Curated annotation (Swiss-Prot):
The lineage of its organism: Eukaryota, Metazoa, Chordata, Craniata, Vertebrata. This is Riparin-1.6. Residues 1-15 form the signal peptide. Disulfide bonds join C47-C53. Expressed by the skin glands. The modification Cysteine amide is found at C53. GO terms for biological process: defense response. Residues 16-41, 57-68 form a propeptide. It is found in: Secreted. Keywords: Amidation, Amphibian defense peptide, Cleavage on pair of basic residues, Disulfide bond, Secreted, Signal. The keyword tRNA-binding does not apply.
Length: 68
């Protein structure tokens, strides 16, 4: 039962995000959202850009240990 409620809420939230973005696209002059606008509206953690989310920096840890 909890899973069904969770999925329903998730669907409502995603539908609202789609409606908001569609409404903003209608009001924009060129009918296109630039990537800069998307980054401002939906900020992502910096690890997304460096592609290191959830990964340890193996090279730096090997260097710190003296290569042992």
């Amino acid at each position: 039962m909890k899973i069904i409620v969770f999925l329903a809420v998730l669907m409502l939230v995603s539908a609202q995000v789609c409606l908001v973005s569609a409404a903003e696209m209608e009001h924009s002059s060129d009918n296109e959202l630039s990537s800069r606008d998307l980054v401002k509206r939906f900020p992502l953690p910096s690890c997304v850009y460096t592609r290191t989310c959830g990964k340890r920096d193996i090279e730096s840890s090997e260097g710190a240990n003296g290569g042992e």
